[in-house]
């Protein structure tokens, strides 16, 4: 047993924890779930954004870890998730001439509930300094029960840039890419402020709705 494993065992006695990915005892992430968070960057297309680079597929252990991080205050998952997002950022920057990162902001309700913005927190952990220029212009309904067209209509006009982005070549950053409605709205707000949208990097994409167009990590 390694020293790190021994220390984790001792910590589990005084502060019981379970794996954010599967619920196994005594580890924040068990040895079976850690490999699931190894980024395998894929690219996708969004009509309003262009290329979207995604680190992970939003399914299985990945989905459970992201939900635990966002909804159950499992901030111990922040480092591995930030590491995965950083690889998507690297791929995006290698393909696009980017001058600024702009994070898609949490909803006001989400920010009040958590006390922090999960995407900003991931970027900070990854050593990035995003521009905090997008804000809610109005409240949007929850997207979960809406069809694709309804999601786009629900998000339209919900974001605004708080200052000029003239001359900025922007890479948008978000957590999960599903229909593209949120990213498209963020792109609209950036363009309205004078910025150019060069694409987006996301932590995960929803594979049931999108088929990858190419793999960027050497796998076929």
Question: Which role fits each region the language model picked out?
Answer:
Residues 1-220:
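Glycine-rich phosphate/pyrophosphate-handling loop used in enzymes and phosphotransfer proteins
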């Amino acid at each position: 047993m390694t020293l790190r494993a021994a220390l984790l065992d001792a910590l589990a006695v005084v502060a019981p924890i379970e794996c954010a990915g599967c619920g196994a005892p005594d580890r924040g992430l068990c040895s079976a779930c850690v490999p699931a968070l190894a980024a395998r960057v894929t690219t996708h297309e969004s009509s309003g954004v262009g290329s979207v680079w995604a680190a992970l597929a939003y399914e299985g252990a990945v989905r459970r870890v992201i939900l635990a991080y966002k909804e159950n205050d499992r901030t111990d998952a922040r480092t591995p998730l930030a590491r995965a997002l950083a690889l998507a950022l690297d791929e995006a920057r290698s393909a696009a001439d980017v001058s600024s990162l702009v994070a898609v902001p949490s909803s006001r309700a989400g920010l009040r509930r958590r006390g922090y913005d999960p995407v900003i927190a991931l970027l900070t952990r990854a050593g990035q300094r995003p521009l905090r220029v997008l804000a809610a212009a109005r409240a949007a309904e929850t997207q979960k029960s809406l069809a694709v067209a309804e999601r786009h209509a629900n998000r339209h006009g919900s974001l605004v840039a708080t200052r000029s982005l003239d001359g900025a070549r922007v890479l948008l950053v978000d957590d999960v890419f599903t229909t593209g409605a949120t990213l498209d709205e963020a792109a609209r707000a950036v363009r309205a402020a004078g910025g150019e949208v060069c694409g987006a990097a996301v932590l995960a994409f929803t594979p049931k709705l999108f088929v990858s167009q190419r793999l960027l990590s050497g796998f076929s």
